[in-house]
Each structure stands twice: as structure tokens, then as C-alpha cells.
């Protein structure tokens, strides 16, 4: 018994050391693993489309090429719209910098706060933070984004093509590599379940984010908020980050509405309420209904995962945090010695329900 406990202790120490080592490797080699992971997640999204195309007697490889080309065209169109908007931001920045000073002076006057443009804390903070330099650099970088990332996009597209090719032949490869029936069924079930759950999560998240961005764009366009395309895109992309992304989108859009429309409180309230309502209705009412149930992951661990992957891979890491956590949880639930980690990653009730679904992997089978 003591030897068994000792071996378990050694195993968990080695597991912890391996996690630390893997974290360091992922941080150092992020330029390689970020495109690879993005391609893997996008492959999960594209897989159902390619599979459905085969029903129309379209060969698998042709379906892959069609889906990738359509995605590339969509990226190109959206990218060009964003580049044009970023150039507009660069040209309009001096106007909004002056507008910020005006708005601040009006607010200071309304609340009887002493205002001196040369010594004001807010103005000095604005200047010391280098907001002007940041906006100019960001706009210039965004303008050249399509050219500087062309290589990365090509690499991701190639990864997607090969991932989708491999997925189709995965079942035969697993059967050949693991001829034992029980082990074969277990591995295939883990792979199938992982693909199904991650595909469902990313697909629903993409649709919700798309409609969120579209509605935010329309509301901003109707009220006349400048750079409506940028606010719509920010709402779309930030919605992939659970909770915090929607909050950040609302703060940025409403903050800019204050900058542009103050002292017209009606328009400011319109923007704030519209963006808040879109995020609340789509994120808290429609999305849970589409998903049917949550992913069974502890909210605290989602927060930890967002922080960890944000530190490792930046903004892209925060977008990928939840899908990666889903994959880890599914694997841990179906490998006996990793079951305790699966329990810690999820809610106890959800884990027990899932465990019943995987019960045919028990040894008696």
C-alpha cells in the first residue's frame, strides 16, 4: 500500500513538473503553436460543412478547398473594411483628441471641478500614457495587417487542409494502431466526443458573436456613431472571451459615444442601452438555449484559464482558452487515472452525468 501511494505521489509530481515544462515551451514557441491551435479549432468548425458537402457528391478534398477558399474570401473582405476604418481613425484622431479636452472641460465645469488644460490630471495622464502614439501606431499596424499576416494566414490554411484530411481517415488509423476492441472504442469515443463538443461550442459561439457584432454595427450606424464597423468588429471578436469580452466591448463603445455625443445624453444612453441589451439577450438568453446546457466547467477555472492563456498567447490565447479547457476536461473524464482532474475541472453534477454517458468504457466491457 505504501509503495502504491509512493508511486502515486511520484506520478503527480512528475505530472506537475510536465505541466510547468509544457507551459514554458508553449510560451517560447508561441509563434508556432498559435497558428497550429487556431487551425485545429477552425478545423472543428469547418468539419461539419465539409461533411455536408459530401452529401451532394462533392469529393472530400474538393469540399475542403471550397470551404477554405470561402473562409479566405470572407477574411479578405472583412480585413479590407477594417483597414479602411483604421486609416479613417488615424486621420480623425486629432479631432477626437481635441474633443476629449472639450468634453473633459464641460464635465469639470458641470461638477465645479477646477480645470486647467496645462495642469489637469486627466489631460496629463492622457499625454503621459502616450494615447496619441498608441492610436497612431495601432492604426498604422492595422493598415499593414493584411500584408504582414499573409504568411501566417497561409500557414493556418495549410494546417486546416491537412487536419481535415486526417480527420476523415482517423477511424481507420486508430483501428490499425490499436487493434484491441475495447481500447479502440475508447479512443474513438474520446476523439468523436471532443470533436462534437468543441465544434458545437465554437460554432454556437461564432454565430452568437456574429449576430452580436452585426447588431452592434447596425445600432451604431443608425445613431451615427463614428467607426461603426470597428465597434461591430470589436463586439464580434471580444464576445469570444466569456463575460469580460462583452463588458470591455460595452465600455469601449459607450465611452466613445460619450466622447462623440456629449452633452447629448439621449444618444449616449441609446448606444449604452443598445449594446448592453444585445450582449445580454444574445449571451444570456439565446446562447444558453442553443447550447442546451453549459459545458460543465467551473466558472473559477474559466477565469484561471483566461488568465493563463492570456499570459501565454495574449488576446488569441484568451479566445482559445475555453475550447482548450473543454478538450482537457473530456480527456481527463475518460482516462481513469486522470478522473480526479476531470472532477476538479467541472461541476460535480455535470461530471456524474457525463460519467454515465462514458460508462461503457468500464473494464467489464
Identify the meaning behind each predicted range:
Residues 4-21, 87-108, 142-159, 213-223, ...:
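Hydrophobic alpha-helical transmembrane segments
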Residues 11, 147-256, 265-270:
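Alpha-helical transmembrane segments and their immediate interhelical loop/hinge regions
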Residues 30-38, 222-233, 262-270, 297-302, ...:
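Membrane-water interface of transmembrane alpha-helices in multipass transporters/channels
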Residues 58-67, 118, 180, 184-188, ...:
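Membrane-interface starts of transmembrane alpha-helices
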Residues 1-84, 160, 176, 325-326, ...:
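Anchoring transmembrane alpha helix of integral membrane proteins
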Residues 42-43, 70-74, 160, 233-244, ...:
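Hydrophobic transmembrane alpha-helices
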